[in-house]
């Protein structure tokens, strides 16, 4: 796609760009992409979450293409800061990308990482916030009101851009622009999204975060997304 530098035949290539998925429960959505790119055989996709498979429900470094092991949310950005500092110390041109859910902003460790990155001018760090405004069991505004996110990040010396997270062309162009930016600031792309978009039964429904669909509902959802 032209944004991330990587080598499926050598996943630990030193000059690769790092992609850290902090919202680890989204890892399963990356498996088909990694298989398409050649990180592992597509036949493995039929074994996801089985005892014999290395493809589990959350990221793991034993999976080619993943940089971190994820458990509790809120740790990805701190790890990314460490990677960004290490790459700077090596004078590497590689970038560190992090995908984080907006609910992770409830965690104090995230704001420590935000302050750290701004203070140390980690301009090789690009954060993407999936701003769907829903946490596991409620709307974010009912748990801790995060607004205005943009102003908060500006104060901590981040370069901020807000986009429609469902507009793929806008996502691509914005990431490319932030990667090529020469300023001394870490960058953040706030992607406004709607959870479950395109499937009426799930769209903007708090419970769709943890809801399992029946087989007939899955078939219907696939048709609605076409």
Give residue spans per PLM region.
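Generic beta-sheet signal
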Residues: 17-19, 94-98, 125, 183-193
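Short, glycine-/Ser/Thr-/acidic-enriched flexible segments
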Residues: 26-27, 37, 132, 168, ...
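Short acidic, glycine/serine/threonine-rich loops at helix termini
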Residues: 31-33, 60, 109-111, 137-141, ...
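Thiamine diphosphate
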Residues: 65, 69-180
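Glycine/aspartate-rich loop-and-adjacent alpha/beta segment that forms the canonical ThDP
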Residues: 168, 172-226
């Amino acid at each position: 796609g032209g944004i991330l530098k990587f080598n499926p035949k050598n996943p630990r290539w030193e000059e690769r760009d790092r992609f850290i998925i902090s919202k680890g429960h989204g890892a399963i959505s990356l498996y088909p992409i990694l298989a398409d790119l050649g990180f592992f055989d597509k036949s493995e996709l039929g074994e996801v979450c089985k005892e014999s498979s290395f493809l589990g429900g959350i990221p793991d470094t034993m999976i080619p293409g993943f940089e971190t092991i994820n458990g509790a949310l809120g740790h990805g950005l701190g790890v990314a800061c460490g990677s960004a500092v290490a790459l700077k110390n090596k004078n590497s041109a590689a970038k560190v990308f992090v995908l984080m859910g907006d609910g992770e902003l409830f965690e104090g460790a995230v704001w420590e990482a935000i302050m750290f990155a701004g203070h140390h001018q980690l301009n090789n760090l690009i954060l993407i916030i999936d701003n769907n405004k829903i946490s596991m069991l409620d709307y974010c505004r009912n748990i801790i009101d995060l607004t205005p996110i943009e102003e908060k990040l500006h104060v901590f010396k981040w370069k901020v851009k807000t986009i429609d997270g469902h507009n793929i062309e806008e996502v691509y162009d914005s990431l490319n622009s932030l990667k090529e930016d020469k300023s001394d600031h870490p960058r953040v792309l706030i992607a406004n999204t709607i959870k479950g978009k395109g499937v009426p039964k799930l769209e903007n429904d708090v419970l769709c975060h943890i809801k399992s669909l029946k087989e007939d509902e899955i078939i219907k959802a696939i048709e609605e997304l076409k």
